């Protein structure tokens, strides 16, 4: 049983690493001059995106190979976004455009070099993320972040209403009448 578990862990690790490098290889081949190579690469690229539940258009401007420590599972990057060199992007990250014309955050994000984006983070709208920025897990960024900054979530707040508290204590369900 332990040997199966070890094999599964090794396979999972290799698959995650392989999918990230395979993603990069297909991404560059999808823009190849030869139409047959381009067609094959785009077909495989779309299959890789579907298999991982990801959405990273091959036309997205990415300056250098980003690091995907947990693979590209659930990563969505808008086509208009720009990502600098040496970025670390964890799973379930969304880097999306705001397409509501006239809104404050209209546009696509621009991310500098050496940026760390924690799992579940959302970067939305025409924001600029400076170089050497660290964005914590599950942060929602809708404003510009200066260089050498760290973005973290606000401390959680617990909101209790007296009526809700009484229901919890009595464990009674009120009638819908």
Description of each model-found segment:
Residues 52, 58, 63-65, 69-70, ...:
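Left-handed beta-helix
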Residues 158-162:
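A short beta-to-alpha transition loop/helix N-cap that caps and shapes the active-site region
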Residues 1-53, 163-177:
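Terminal amphipathic alpha-helical/low-complexity segments used for targeting or macromolecular assembly
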Residues 27, 70-71:
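Short, flexible active-site loops
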């Amino acid at each position: 049983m332990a040997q199966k578990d070890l094999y599964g862990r090794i396979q999972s690790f290799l698959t995650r690493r392989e999918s990230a490098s395979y993603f990069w290889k297909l991404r560059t081949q999808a823009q190849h001059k030869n139409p047959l190579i381009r067609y094959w690469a785009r077909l495989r690229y779309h299959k890789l995106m579907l298999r991982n539940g990801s959405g990273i258009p091959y036309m997205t401007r990415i300056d250098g190979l980003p690091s995907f420590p947990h693979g590209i599972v659930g990563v969505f990057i808008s086509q208009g976004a720009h990502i600098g060199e040496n970025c670390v992007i964890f799973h379930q990250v969304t880097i999306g455009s705001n397409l509501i014309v006239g809104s404050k955050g209209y546009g696509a994000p621009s991310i500098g070099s050496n940026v760390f984006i924690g799992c579940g983070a959302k970067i939305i709208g025409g924001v600029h993320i400076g170089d050497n920025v660290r964005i914590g897990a599950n942060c929602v960024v809708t404003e510009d972040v200066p260089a050498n900054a760290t973005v973290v979530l606000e401390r959680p707040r617990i909101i209790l209403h007296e009526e809700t508290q009484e229901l919890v204590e009595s464990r009674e369900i009120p009638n819908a009448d």
